Amino acid sequence: MNSLNKEILRLALPSILANITVPLVGIVDTAVAGHLTGTEAAVAIGAISVGAMFFSLLYWNFSFLRTGTGGLTAQAYGAGDQREVAKIFWRGMALSAAVALLVLLLQWPFLKVAVLCTQASPEVEALASQYFLIRIWAAPATISLMTFSGWFVGMQDSMSSMWKDLVVNGVNIVASIILGRGIGSWPGLGFAGIALGTVIAQYCGLLFCIVVCLVKYRRVLGAFRLSELRQALSRSELGPYMRMNGNLFLRSVSMLGVYIGYPLIATTMGDMLLACSAVMMQLLMLFSYFTDGFAYAGEALVGRFIGARDNVSMRRSVRYVFIWSMSIALAFIGIYWVGGVPVLRLLTSDPAVVQACSAFLPWLILMPPVGCAAFTWDGVFLGATASRPLRDSCVWAFVAFLGVWFVLRWLFLDSGTPDVVGDSGAVFPDPSPTVIPGPIGNLPLHFLMVAYFAHLAVRTVWLSAKWKSIRDL
């Protein structure tokens, strides 16, 4: 194995390991909520789900703090410019503090709007609101950790990023169990303890990152004096940085539109297809936990080699990262092809749900190649700080997602609804444009899967076409 492949694995494997722990937090929180005494399990689990969705809506909009910091830091690192590396860090921290303050100030208006957009029961809304109003106080830590994550990636330091995630997720799991369920003779705090556990975990992660910077990066960060921060935040220096982050913000909003639109559309299809859509998305996102590790490696190496003006190594790193990413895609195609039904049985013990989901297994075989390509290109373009193609690809992907869904719905569901063959053989018009009985009753979710595939394909094709605009940087 050559040195570049070793470098890719050094950067990717810690990220993959950290990513694998992410779903464990949600599983544990759900399990704790489902076993609380004095609270109906369905209400508590539903409140965790709704509350988590509130924070996804909120924090995903600020993911540009991570993505914008990573590429810039990697380029400064590659150029050997320690002062620029430090300036990017402190500017990111200042912006994170400002964003966190804004989030805390707007927590009540945001919550009111978010609750209005849900169709949950009053009991679920009340618990979800309680969860939100506790967990929101982790905002300063959570938003700062986004900047730390990007900066560590740019510094080619995936180990610190991994340990940060392991600390956050590990503390979250332990704290939520203890605070929610209690320990020994102490009964715990109940539902509020789950939210408080997340708050404690985020601040533990922040403390860990501060210690890492003091021990490992004190000299690097000392290359930039805090007295110079005003100049770094001036209009002349902040302008290009904010334009790039503005593009990345629009990218985040477009992606959020797809990943919020998918479950919202699925809620119109009835309980069985809604359950199938949730299972399919979990399996579709599973391979992204692995691919993202190589996307982060691509981001770090592309930025570093661009900063070092080493175009040959930059192109080689992109080629090798894609080989690793496509290997992940092929592995998951094999897993879904050979073990699709057993994998479904791991997620649900309901035979009816397993049988219904099996109709959508072909999508699990089609998605990995185009999905892995889209995610890997994201890392490459982030490393090159080419925010405009990233913005455009996601905006058009969102348009494609909605366009494909509504066109297919209009052509086959809303108008010209199929007929239903009755027991006597007589043909009756189907009164429902959404839930179609009979052998083609799965069409709505198939159409939604087509729309999701189209969104990934647009991202892949768009960025593939734009590769020539950055390969000679």
Which residue stretches match the model-derived regions?
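Short alpha-helical transmembrane segments in multi-pass integral membrane proteins
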Residues: 1-12, 73-140, 186-246, 302-367, ...
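Transmembrane helical elements of multi-pass membrane transporters/channels
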Residues: 10-30, 134, 167-168, 201-205, ...
